[in-house]
Structure formats: structure tokens, C-alpha cells
Amino acid sequence: MKTWNDGKTIAIERCVLPLDASLHKGSSGRVGVLGGSARYTGAPYYAAMASLQAGADLAFVFCAQEATLPIKSYSPELMVAPVYSASDFDPVRLVDDMVNEIGDMLPKLHCLVVGPGLGRCPLVMKAVARVLELARSQQLHLVLDADALYMMSLPVYRSSLKGYDRLVLTPNVVEYQRLFPKSEDNNGESMEDASDEELAAATIVRKGAEDRIIVDQRQVMSCGEEGGLKRSGGIGDVLAGTLGTFTSWHAILLDREAVSTEDLPLSCWTACCAVKRATKRAFDDKRRAMTAPDVLHHLGQALDEMTRED
């Protein structure tokens, strides 16, 4: 499948959580975003807001104390929790406090998006690795983006999620080559060596002009929806948050036994189609002035129209 029209019927049936009067707050998805540092505060905001615009009910941001006030000031809709401080020079306390703070929240989530604005502090990555272990033990859906992908390229962490099939990775071309250095696939045409034993169970969303969904070293589908021509910073974070919503819906439908784990790539493809459409609308509206907030503005309407099309 390439465009939304190629697969919309099955995608709506198996990937979009129905709305009905029996739902309560949180029934349509609770997404956590682990990211945000003193230097990077926009990325976790874009990811969390995208999850809400795509249809999730609640969005949490777990970030550095230094990022808390800026992110809170961007929107009252986000629940923002400081989980560590960059000024804490006790490495054991920093890691333990971060793991405990986030660990208490994991049972309340349907999906955890990790990486937007995270930074590459070794202590933070050490704590994140422990959080991922906890999430895996609870069968929580995970979306890894940005600095979390860099972390997974490091030998010390690479096998930490080996065999986990509720994992989505979202590399761009550069991140993909860092994750899979043996791959000679610069144009996305050949999938040989596109994965390895450690990450073979993951669903990989390789971002580009045509987003490609890769599972077990082979491309299973691609998103050929037309997007905008402007590559503004933050659009990848919008996709990460949208994937957070769709993987949350997958988790909810999985609990209802309405879908199987094999439907996760289809959920990712649907999220890619939605963001491409929103990006195209934003670009048509703003052209060169388009930025990530413009994509957020169009995301909900684009997704609603997609699911209502005859």
C-alpha cells in the first residue's frame, strides 16, 4: 500500500479507535513523552501535542527540571513532570530518582514515546535504559525517536530491547545508517541488512519523501502520500507523537482482542499518512513560512477527513 486510498478501509477498521458514548477520560489513549532538557524544550511539546491532536485523551511529559516551566508555558493541556535535574551531581540519585518517578507512571500509560529533546547525557541514557526495561516488563508500547535512536546505536544498549515486538523506531536517513551501518541502502530500494538480530522484532518507520515501514529486515509497506516541500524542525516530533496515539490505540484494541501484534505496522503506516496529509495542508497554506505548529494545526482535521472519506 502507498496512498491512503489504497488501504483506508482496512486501516480504519483495524487502526482507528472508534468513538462512542461509553468512553471516559483516558479511554482513547494515554501517551507519555520522555524527553526535554535544558537545551531542547520544543521537541517534547510537539510530540505530546501531536498525540492529542491525533486523538489521544491525555499526554504526559517527563523531562528535566530545567525544561518544566518552558513546556508548561507552551500549553495547559500537557501534564509535565520533572523527573531529574541537570544540576544534580549525584549520579546514583539522579538515575534512581528518574527511574522511580517515571516507573510509577508507566502502568497508567498505553504508550511511551522516548527521545524528543532528550539530549545525550550518559547518566540520562543510563536511566532511560532502565525505564525501557520496566516498560518492556509491563508490555508497554514504545516509540523511540531522535536521541533515543542514538542511544540504541550504542553497543551497551543495542540489545536491551532484543525480541520486543511492541517497539517502533523512527529513524531518518542519517539515523537509519547509524543504527544499521552495514546497510548500503541509501535510496530505500534494497532492504538487505536493514535490520539485525537485536532490532529484528521492531517495526521501523524510515522517514523520507516516502516513509517506509520495515519489519524483520524487509519492507512491508510504504507511505506515498504527498507531503509538503518544507522540512521544518519539529515535524519528526509531530510524527513521533502521532505514532504514540496510534500505538496506544493498537494497545487498546489488542487488549480487546480486536487486532493482533501483526497489525502494528499498519498502525504506523496510518500515522504516516495522517502526518503527510497535515504537512501538505500546512505547506499549501504557509509555503516557505511553514513550521511545525502549522502541521499541528492541520493534523486533527486531516485525520478526521481521512476517516470520514467515502
Swiss-Prot record:
Gene Ontology MF terms: ATP binding; ATP-dependent NAD(P)H-hydrate dehydratase activity
Keyword Cell wall biogenesis/degradation: no
Binding site for (6S)-NADPHX: G117, N172, V173, V174, E175, Y176, Q177, R178, D237
Any GO BP: nicotinamide nucleotide metabolic process
Signal sequence extent: none
Record has Amino-acid biosynthesis as a keyword: no
Catalytic reaction annotation: (6S)-NADHX + ATP = ADP + phosphate + NADH + H(+); (6S)-NADPHX + ATP = ADP + phosphate + NADPH + H(+)
Keywords annotated in UniProt: ATP-binding, Lyase, NAD, NADP, Nucleotide-binding, Phosphoprotein
Disulfide cysteine pairs (residue numbers): none
Cofactor(s) listed in the protein's UniProt record: Mg(2+)
The protein's Enzyme Commission number: 4.2.1.93
Residue sites binding ATP per the record: 207-211, 227-236
Family: Belongs to the NnrD/CARKD family.
Protein name per Swiss-Prot or TrEMBL: ATP-dependent (S)-NAD(P)H-hydrate dehydratase
